[in-house]
Amino acid sequence: MLSWKNDLTPVSDRFDDIYFSPENGLEETRHVFIGGNDLPDRWRNSNIQNPFCILELGFGTGLNFFATWKEYLKQDNRFRLHFISVEKFPLSRKEISKAVSAFPELEEIKEEFLSSYQDLIPGMNYFRFLEGKIHLTLFLGDVSDALCEISGKADAIFLDGFAPSKNPEMWEESVLGNLKNVSKFGTTFSTFTVARTVRNSLSYAGFTLEKRPGFGKKREMLTGKYSNYPSETKESLPKEKPWCKRSDPESQIKTATIIGAGIAGSTLAYSLSKRGIQVFLIDPSGIANETSGIPRAISHPHLTKIPGPISLFTLRAFRYALSFLSSFADKDQFGKVGSFHGVTAEMNPERFRKSIENHKLTEEIASWKPNGSDFHKNDPFNKELEEGVLFRNGFWTRPGSIARKCVDQPGIELIQATANSFERIGSSWKLDLKESDQKVLADSIIFCNSYLIGKLASSLFEGEEIFPINKVRGQLISLKETENSSRVPNILCAEHYLTPSVQGEHVLGSTFDEFDLNPKPRKKDTDLLLQYVQTKYPTLRFDSNCVLSEKTGFRAQTPDRFPIIGPIFDPKIFQETYKEIDLPRNRNKKFPNLKVIPGLYVFGGLGSRGILSSFLGAEILASLILGEPAPVEFSLLESLHPARFLYRRIRK
């Protein structure tokens, strides 16, 4: 809860402390944090391949972020700015708007931020502004948890929690000591407090300290630099998963070859091109002309009863995709209509309710709608629905159209040919193509070619397939709207899904068949889908005359139904290095942090959540390729890591 001092300065009732100086909060920010870290002078030396990262403890009203954004706009050289902030008690849109309204020069920035400040979830929330020049990762939760999950290194640190006397937990020695794990030699910090306990903790963590004149009535403030060279840990214990340790690229990445121009490859091409990378996009069939070419796809989070990798990833992917598409997609490419998921044998009422409760989700994300709720009463069609979960901002997309728009960017060259063979030449990769005499040379190669990833990559490893990606058939149908179906407001999900009518057409999908590789539509699948919709929603009055078209496609699915995103190891070296890592006697033995194959990455196994996963997945992989802070927790990077399948082989 907030109170207001003189109706202008926000005061936290929880901590009985002000969020910023009543004298002039914006000038205080500029003096203590922007000036305290010497940002204007340092930024003159940044370039597009060296993004600048700021870590902030205490997002509060967002004033420091807005002021930093404003300062960034003064720079002629628009490098990428990563701003990572931690906030345990986030303010509402209304509270932030009122607090920052005291500074009219920030109005435009504030409004752009607030347009994306929604659908928030515990943990990391990722935002992009200024066409990808500014990246904000907002961690909602405890600062101790946040510092364990940040995977990048900061160039500057803003320590801006409430006063140590008011909020001692944020200033504990264990918290400030962990700053060394997110710092590099020369990382600066600044803070308004010069409390002895803070000085001692920062000094012990390896920071040199300097007192400077404070702002306004504060006589002094504190700045400093991380003066240690972080020792490169070359070995780790088995429980630390040594194969997951991040390492920066060995050389500067300027070019990338992406194999596969479906939704995964197209979104990755977009993310890399926005970072100044020249992209060669290889696909014999063109852009999204295989499974990604379905007429419409639907997206909402997949909730498990207990928070785990799948639900945590899909929640983050959903809110980022929603934010990205809301500003990127054209009206006929994307529709935020809400998605209602009815009860099924797998998702019973207890599981649904517990999922929402255990993930601490607000109604912006998901809410349980029992029979007789306002959701059912307020719409004539909804009265016929059973109880279930409403994902208020569930959405549909036209994947093919979105993919083509992603690729229609400067710096992306589409080559319609088949990848044939690979060769490492110096620090680059050469790709030979079928159906083309063109030789492609790039700093990195990324496999995004769906269920063919394992087969194509195996040519690098003497025919050994290291990615167990299965080909799973699905069929959907397009239906002409009926008088009744034209009034359906939401996506309807249960055993199958039905989109609302768009331009007189519904999409009903999808079947799931792991053992049939027939690429042609089958009448029995069309009949199955029709029978489902007629039984589930009889008042919509669909019949066989409503069928406009049928389409089959093949999902690329991993055994754990989780994407593969990250670098690639040599399987033989991995086996030899870690073959005894799981033996009980080696529990306390350290193993080498194995180096990945330089410039080789994979992005696939998205299964039935291709659209949902692609946008955030592309940002994750772009950050790994270029050595940037990742937009998700380190624990999620571990779960997504391609080497998990090599490790499971060893355990067998």
From Swiss-Prot:
Alphabetical list of InterPro entries matching this protein:
FAD-dep_OxRdtase, FAD/NAD-bd_sf, MnmC-like_methylTransf, SAM-dependent_MTases_sf, tRNA_MAMT_biosynth_bifunc_MnmC, tRNA_MNMC2, tRNA_S-uridine_synth_MnmC_C
Identify a single GO molecular function assigned to this protein.
Answer: oxidoreductase activity, acting on the CH-NH group of donors
* Highest taxon, organism lineage: Bacteria
Per its record, the protein catalyses: 5-aminomethyl-2-thiouridine(34) in tRNA + S-adenosyl-L-methionine = 5-methylaminomethyl-2-thiouridine(34) in tRNA + S-adenosyl-L-homocysteine + H(+)
Positions of the UniProt region annotated as FAD-dependent cmnm(5)s(2)U34 oxidoreductase: 259-652
List required co-factors: FAD
Residue segments, region tRNA (mnm(5)s(2)U34)-methyltransferase: 1-227
Localization terms from the record: Cytoplasm
Which Pfam families does the record associate with it? DAO, Methyltransf_30
Coiled-coil regions in this chain?
Answer: none
Keyword rRNA-binding found: no
Q: Reply yes or no: does the keyword Chloroplast apply.
A: no
Name the PANTHER family on file: SARCOSINE DEHYDROGENASE-RELATED, TRNA 5-METHYLAMINOMETHYL-2-THIOURIDINE BIOSYNTHESIS BIFUNCTIONAL PROTEIN MNMC
Q: What is this protein called?
A: tRNA 5-methylaminomethyl-2-thiouridine biosynthesis bifunctional protein MnmC
